[in-house]
Amino acid sequence: MDATRHSGLECLRIISIILIVSMHILGNTFHTGNWLNKEFILFINTLGNTGVTLFILISGYFGIRFNTHKFFKMLVVVWFYSIVSYLIETIWLHTPHTWTGLASSLLPILSKKYWFMTCYVVLYCFSPYLNRLVHNLSQKSYKQLLLLWGFFFVFAPTILFFEIQNDTGKGIINVTLAYLIGQYLKTYGLPENMK
């Protein structure tokens, strides 16, 4: 494990977390019909989603090292908060109880109740294989993989409105792409024309 401190990347990770938290707090605060509030929410959501991509990109740069104990600890934490949030919603906020809602809360990863945690858990499970894959590809093959992935899952839906995966960018496809880009940057650095 690399013991070198990367204070710039650590700071960027903190900024990405702040953007994500701001999106969730402010995005749920301004819900009037005012067009200015709608534009503000759109702006905050854009920043927050950028924060998600940055967070995964940095995770890719450092690489996820699978650890069974940490994996199960993460699952327990997600499950705990899922159950607690369900109880708060049904008991204190008087949200009607549904069997679907209960099942979703009992199986938050499989039901994709929290899209990011579902994606992160899947990425965490596949990380040993992704890490091995990228270290066995030549730089040229790695670039081709990223370009193909980017074309079909970023460029085509954004510019051509041709969406293969209907997840509006909030799914395992884009999370994996950001992770792979982070791994590429760690291995090969920035391309010369971007320095």
Task: Give, region by region, the residue ranges found by the protein language model.
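Short, aromatic-rich membrane-interface segments at the entry and exit
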Residues: 71, 142, 165-173
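Membrane-cytosol interface segments of multi-pass membrane proteins
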Residues: 1-153, 193-194
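Short, well-structured alpha-helical interface segments that form or flank functional binding sites
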Residues: 55, 171, 176
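Membrane-interface helix caps and helix-loop-helix hairpins in membrane proteins
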Residues: 106-111, 158-169
